[in-house]
Design a protein with these regions (language model features):
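Short alpha-helical scaffolding segments that buttress acidic/His motifs in well-ordered protein cores
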Residues: 196-200, 241-252, 289, 330, ...
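A glycine/threonine-rich phosphate-anchoring loop and its flanking beta-alpha core
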Residues: 10, 110-209, 306
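ATP/NTP phosphate-donor binding region
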Residues: 1-88, 343
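Short Gly/Thr/Asp-enriched flexible loops that form oxyanion-binding sites at enzyme active sites
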Residues: 77-78, 97-111, 146-149
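Active-site segments that bind and position negatively charged phosphate/pyrophosphate groups
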Residues: 202, 206-329
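Glycine/serine-rich anion-binding loops at beta->alpha junctions
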Residues: 86-102, 138-144, 276-279
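C-terminal charged capping/lid subdomain of soluble metabolic enzymes
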Residues: 311-387
Length: 387
C-alpha cells in the first residue's frame, strides 16, 4: 500500500426525511444562494421542501446550470454572488450542479483581474479560498457531494477540464434516496455507469497489496451490478435506491483511492467526446472503458484477473480468456442498463478522432493512466477500437 493523506470532512445526512436537519447546517445569518439545474427540482417539489426548511433565512436562487456545466452560465452566477454578497451556496441537484457550484464558489473569491477560467487551466492549484457550500443531492452518480473535484465545460472553445481544491469540498450533503424515485431511466442508468467507472479507475490499475481498498471497491461494484438494474425496474424500492446512492458517494469520496494507483484515462478521453459531440458523461465512459482495458490488458493484467474472479466470478480458462470474459461482462452490464458502448451506437464514425487527439494534446493529456504510458498514439488506438 502506498502512503496517503486522507481527509473526508463532508458531513452526510442520509435517509428518508434527512432534510429536517438542513437548516442547522447553515449559519443562521448567512446570505444563501440556492443553485439548481433545468427545473426538475421545482416539478418534484424538492426545491419547495428546501425553501420551507430555510424559511425566514436570506435566500436567493440561481437556476439553469446545464449537464456538463458551462463556464458562460456559471459566470452569470459569479456576478450575482459578488453583487449580492452571498456568503453560502446550497446546491439542489446532481453532479453537474455540484461541479458548477464548486466553480462559482472558487471564482467568486478569485482575484477580479484574473479570468476565472484560470482555475481550470491550473487545475485549481491557485485557489486560496472559496465560499462555503452544501448540497441536497437528487442524482446519485458523480460523488461530487463529498469530494473536492469538479469538471467544467467552455462552449466557446469546446473545452472540458477538471480542477481540484479542498476549498470547494461541500461542508455537508443531504442524501435522501426518496428524491431519486422520479429520475428518468436514462439518468439512473448513467449514474450507475458513472459510479462503476469511478470505482474501477481506482481499482483496475496495478496491485499494491491494498486489501481494504480493493475489497471496498469490489463491494461497491457488486452492489451496483446487483442493484443498478433493480433501480430501473423498481424505481420506488427504497432499499435499492439507498444502496445505489451510497455506492455512488463511496465510489469517489477518497476512501477507495487512498494509497492505491489511480488511472482516470477513461475520463480524460471521455471528456473530449463530451466536449466535441455533446454525449452524456456516462455514455463516453461506457464507450472508452472496454476499449482502454483491451488496449492496456498487459499492464493491468493482475488487477483485471482479480476483477474477473472477484466481481464476475470468472475462474475458467486462460488468463487472456478470463480477461476477455471480464471485459465482455462489463460491456454487457452497461448495455443492459441501456448505455451503448460503441461510438457507432451514437451515430459517430470516428472521423473526429484526429480532432479529439488534438484537444488531448492541447490539454496536456499525453501521458495518461496509472503508468503515464497512454500517449496520444495509444489514445488514438483506444478511440479507433471504440468505433
Amino acid at each position: 500500500m502506498n502512503n496517503f493523506n486522507l481527509h473526508t470532512p463532508t458531513r452526510i445526512l442520509f435517509g428518508k426525511g434527512a432534510i429536517a436537519g438542513l437548516r442547522e447546517q447553515i449559519p443562521h445569518d448567512a446570505r444563501v444562494l440556492i443553485t439548481y439545474g433545468g427545473g426538475s427540482v421545482k416539478k418534484t417539489g424538492v426545491l419547495d421542501q428546501v425553501l420551507d426548511a430555510l424559511k425566514g433565512m436570506d435566500v436567493l436562487e440561481f437556476g439553469g446550470i446545464e449537464p456538463n456545466p458551462a463556464y458562460e452560465t456559471l459566470m452569470n452566477a459569479v456576478k450575482l454572488v459578488r453583487e449580492q454578497k452571498v456568503t453560502f451556496l446550497l446546491v439542489v441537484g446532481g453532479g453537474s450542479v455540484l461541479d458548477g457550484t464548486k466553480f462559482i464558489a472558487a471564482a467568486a473569491n478569485y482575484p477580479e483581474n484574473i479570468d476565472p477560467w484560470h482555475i481550470l487551466q491550473t487545475g485549481g492549484k491557485e485557489i486560496k479560498s472559496a465560499i462555503p457550500m452544501g448540497c441536497v443531492l437528487t442524482l446519485p452518480a458523480t460523488g461530487s457531494e463529498s469530494n473536492a473535484g469538479a469538471v467544467i465545460s467552455r462552449k466557446t472553445t469546446g473545452d472540458k477540464q477538471a480542477f481540484h481544491s479542498a476549498h470547494v469540498q461541500p461542508v455537508f450533503a443531504v442524501l435522501d434516496p426518496v428524491y431519486t424515485y422520479t429520475l428518468p431511466p436514462r439518468q439512473v442508468a448513467n449514474g450507475v455507469v458513472d459510479a462503476f467507472v469511478h470505482t474501477v479507475e481506482q481499482y483496475v490499475t496495478k496491485p499494491v497489496d491494498a486489501k481494504i481498498q480493493d475489497r471496498f471497491a469490489e463491494g461497491i461494484l457488486l452492489t451496483l451490478i446487483e442493484d443498478g438494474p433493480k433501480a430501473l425496474k423498481e424505481p420506488e424500492n427504497y432499499d435499492v435506491r439507498a444502496n445505489v446512492m451510497w455506492a455512488a458517494t463511496q465510489a469517489l469520496n477518497g476512501l477507495i483511492g487512498a494509497g492505491v494507483p489511480q488511472d482516470w484515462a477513461t475520463h480524460m478521453l471521455g471528456h473530449e467526446l463530451t466536449a466535441m459531440h455533446g454525449l452524456d458523461h456516462a455514455q463516453t465512459l461506457a464507450i472508452v472503458l472496454p476499449a482502454l482495458w483491451n488496449e492496456k490488458r498487459d499492464t493491468k493484467r493482475a488487477k483485471l484477473l482479480q476483477y474477473a474472479e472477484r466481481v464476475w466470478n470468472i475462474t475458467e480458462g486462460s488468463d487472456d480468456e478470463r480477461i476477455d470474459a471480464a471485459i465482455a461482462a462489463t460491456r454487457n452490464f452497461f448495455e443492459q442498463l441501456g448505455v451503448p458502448t460503441h461510438l457507432s451506437d451514437y451515430g459517430l464514425d470516428g472521423s473526429s478522432i484526429p480532432a479529439l487527439l488534438k484537444k488531448l494534446e492541447e490539454h496536456g493529456m499525453t501521458q495518461l493512466g496509472e503508468n503515464h504510458d497512454i500517449t496520444l498514439d495509444v489514445s488514438r488506438r483506444i478511440y479507433e477500437a471504440a468505433r
